[in-house]
């Protein structure tokens, strides 16, 4: 498949809309930022492609990190692909992945690669440094690291 030709500024704008939607936990803004068949990899279990797969995740993040901020540290573009290195910060004020609120500040890295189609993000490969966050709050979700 041939890469769509877009400018660096168009690619950056598309990805910045996506991160604004995540930071604001705004599904309507996400629907404007991504294609209707947007793939988020690794895909949340039991969800089909598209922006609505983020509804429960946004709800959990709104409760867990209500003051969440996302700072884009680096953005690299090539053709219709954008690589992002960013940092999430906030206070774990509500349950997150089964861990009760700790009221502790957290800061962790995220790394993503995005594919752009029709001025929207059509595919995202995304990794978060959850281990760093778990170390900061002093707990891991039940079942992780138990050898089970």
Where do the model's predicted regions map?
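C-terminal and inter-domain tail/linker signature
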Residues: 1-148
């Amino acid at each position: 498949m041939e890469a769509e030709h877009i400018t660096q500024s168009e690619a950056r704008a598309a990805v910045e809309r996506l991160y604004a939607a995540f930071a604001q936990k705004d599904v309507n803004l996400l629907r404007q930022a991504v294609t209707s068949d947007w793939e988020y990899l690794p895909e949340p279990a039991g969800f089909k492609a598209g922006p609505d797969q983020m509804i429960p995740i946004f709800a959990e993040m709104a409760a867990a990190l209500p003051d969440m901020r996302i700072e884009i540290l680096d953005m690299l573009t090539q053709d219709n692909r954008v690589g992002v290195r960013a940092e999430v910060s906030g206070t774990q004020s509500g349950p997150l992945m089964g861990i009760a609120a700790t009221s502790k500040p957290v800061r962790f890295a995220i790394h993503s690669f995005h594919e752009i189609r029709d001025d929207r993000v059509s595919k995202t490969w995304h990794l978060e440094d959850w281990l760093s966050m778990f170390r900061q709050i002093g707990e891991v979700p039940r079942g992780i690291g138990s050898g089970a």
